[in-house]
């Protein structure tokens, strides 16, 4: 993926986030088991090279002390890696595990969670409203100098769930005996796996979820966007997440992240959309925003059934449907596997290509990273680290 393309698209996303949305939320309004914040509030920008970051995390090998834990009682173990912990920007720990549901805090009595704790490590977070992840207490104790409470985290859901990336915070620790890893809040878990009906006693059992938790004081979500119970400004979370992941991607030579202009975040309410018909469920991404139409780079930047036309969200009755938000026509990609439905990755952009060949081995199609021919589908060959025809 060209660095210039990635950086320009990420900069546009950050600019939209900082000037168009500026949305404050009343956390209590979303403190419901089936009425939490929508996924779009904390999903990564479509410009982020999610598949490439997921592949890089799978290759991590550096093991710090106190880093290996079971993912459940008598189960296989997962190791937290520190390959990325030494970066000056975008420094992070990463690991791959399953996803159990944590309801500690405000919703400690959630379904399937009879023994929940009334508090989380740095407050009493709402598991219904806050997308947070959990780290073993022993690992936290060993890394208190760099691992901070309420630090921004990124979660890449399993490939079987379309491999989406969502942002959250490091909000709680696990002190069970034995301590386990692979745990996230009710909201994060049910957003990642909406078809599995997860609860406090039913988690996602496959160890195919990638967790990234950023380190240092600059990675901590500020009090202006968070109180002891709720996230109050998801725009701040998304902006910080995109910036940190962008820096990480640049460090990993995955195509950009640095050089973005500073983002000015506001905390005022967004004016109601005008100049268009019907309602708009995503303020700042509507057709009539300030009578001009919100700025966009792809259809995924626009609310409801709006389409991105000439850089503006607009009504389009002929807009094509897309089953994988963030990977629709116009989204940035590194291979065909990054694109929804029948779209193909052409020159780094998900596009319609009626001549595209099918690929039976997801994640190993043309354009995917490889180390040998065996890593590539069908008749594809590994050339210069990429599966090619």
UniProtKB/Swiss-Prot annotation:
Pfam families xrefs: Glyco_hydro_75
Catalytic activity: Endohydrolysis of beta-(1->4)-linkages between D-glucosamine residues in a partly acetylated chitosan
Signal sequence, renumbered to the chain: 1-22
An individual GO BP term: polysaccharide catabolic process
Location of this chain's protein in the cell: Secreted
Transmembrane segments: none
Keyword line: Carbohydrate metabolism, Glycosidase, Hydrolase, Polysaccharide degradation, Repeat, Secreted, Signal
Disulfide bonds: none
Superkingdom of origin organism: Eukaryota
Enzyme class: hydrolase
Positions of R repeats: 280-313, 320-350, 357-387
Record-level GO cellular component terms: extracellular region
EC number of the protein: 3.2.1.132
Alphabetized GO MF terms: chitosanase activity
Domain notes: The C-terminal R3 domain contains 3 tandem repeats required for the binding to insoluble chitosan.
PANTHER family named among the record's database cross-references: ENDO-CHITOSANASE
Family classification: Belongs to the glycosyl hydrolase 75 family.
Name under which the protein is recorded: Endo-chitosanase C
Species of the source: Aspergillus oryzae (strain ATCC 42149 / RIB 40) (Yellow koji mold)
Gene: csnC
């Amino acid at each position: 993926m060209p660095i210039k393309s990635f950086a320009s698209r990420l900069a546009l996303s950050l600019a939209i986030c900082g000037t168009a949305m500026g949305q404050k939320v009343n956390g209590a309004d979303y403190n419901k088991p089936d009425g939490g914040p929508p996924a779009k509030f904390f999903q990564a920008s479509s410009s982020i090279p999610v598949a490439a970051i997921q592949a890089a995390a799978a290759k991590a090998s550096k093991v710090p002390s106190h880093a290996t834990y079971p993912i459940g009682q008598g189960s296989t173990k997962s190791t937290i890696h520190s390959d990325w912990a030494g970066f000056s920007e975008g420094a992070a720990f990463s690991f791959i595990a399953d996803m159990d549901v944590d309801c500690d805090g405000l919703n400690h009595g959630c379904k399937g969670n009879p023994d929940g704790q009334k508090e989380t490590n740095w407050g009493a977070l709402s598991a219904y409203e806050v997308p947070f992840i959990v780290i073993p207490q022993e690992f936290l104790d060993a890394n208190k100098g760099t691992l901070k409470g309420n630090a921004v985290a990124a979660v890449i859901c399993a490939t079987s769930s379309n491999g989406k990336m969502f942002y959250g915070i490091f909000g709680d620790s696990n002190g069970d005996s034995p301590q386990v890893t692979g745990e996230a809040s009710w909201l994060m878990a049910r957003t990642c796996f909406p078809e599995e009906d997860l609860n406090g006693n039913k988690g996602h059992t496959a160890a195919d979820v990638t967790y990234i938790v950023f380190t240092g004081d600059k990675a901590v979500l500020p009090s202006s966007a968070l109180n002891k119970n709720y996230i109050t400004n998801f725009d701040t979370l998304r902006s910080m997440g995109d910036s940190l992941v962008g820096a990480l991607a640049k460090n990993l030579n995955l195509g950009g992240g640095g050089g973005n202009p500073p983002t000015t975040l506001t905390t005022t309410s967004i004016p109601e959309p005008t100049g268009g018909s019907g309602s708009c469920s995503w303020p700042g991404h509507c057709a009539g925003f300030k009578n001009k139409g919100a700025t966009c780079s792809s259809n995924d930047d626009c609310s409801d059934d709006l389409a991105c036309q000439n850089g503006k969200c607009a009504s389009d009755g002929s807009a094509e449907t897309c089953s994988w938000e963030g990977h629709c026509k116009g989204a940035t990609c590194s291979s065909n596997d990054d694109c929804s439905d029948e779209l193909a990755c052409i020159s780094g952009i998900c596009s319609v290509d009626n001549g595209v060949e099918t690929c039976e081995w997801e994640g190993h199609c043309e354009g995917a990273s490889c180390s040998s021919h065996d890593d590539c589908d069908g008749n594809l060959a590994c050339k210069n680290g990429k599966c090619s025809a």
